[in-house]
């Protein structure tokens, strides 16, 4: 679970919950097959579809001028009847 960083709770991701789609931030080196196995074993659900994307790189302006780390997110679509309760998500 160290490669699965945290669930994403934005306005868009909350609206996707109605379609059984869950958004997570992941380690940038993880593959789709590794992420699918991790979600299925940890939450005991069946993943039927996945989309991955990187957030755009932003520049720091305050103390140091440079680029922030690139972040990878994945949207997992679950089988009908499956869900991930947010009370079971512990990212510590």
Curated annotation (Swiss-Prot):
InterPro entries: Nucleotide-bd_a/b_plait_sf, Ribosomal_uL23-like, Ribosomal_uL23/eL15/eS24_sf. GO terms for cellular component: chloroplast; ribonucleoprotein complex; ribosome. GO terms for molecular function: rRNA binding; structural constituent of ribosome. It holds the Pfam family Ribosomal_L23. One of its GO terms (biological process) is translation. It is found in: Plastid, Chloroplast. Keywords: Chloroplast, Plastid, Ribonucleoprotein, Ribosomal protein, RNA-binding, rRNA-binding. Binds to 23S rRNA. Part of the 50S ribosomal subunit. Belongs to the universal ribosomal protein uL23 family. This is Large ribosomal subunit protein uL23c. It comes from Chara vulgaris. The lineage of its organism: Eukaryota, Viridiplantae, Streptophyta, Charophyceae, Charales.
């Amino acid at each position: 679970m160290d490669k699965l960083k945290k669930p994403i709770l934005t306005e868009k991701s909350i609206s996707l919950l109605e379609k059984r789609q869950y958004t997570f931030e992941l380690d940038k080196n993880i593959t789709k097959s590794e992420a699918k196995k991790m979600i299925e074993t940890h939450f005991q659900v069946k993943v039927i579809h996945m989309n991955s994307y990187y957030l755009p790189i932003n520049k720091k302006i305050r103390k140091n001028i440079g680029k922030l780390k690139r972040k990878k997110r994945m949207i997992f679509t679950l089988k009908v009847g499956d869900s991930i309760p947010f009370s079971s998500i512990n990212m510590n």
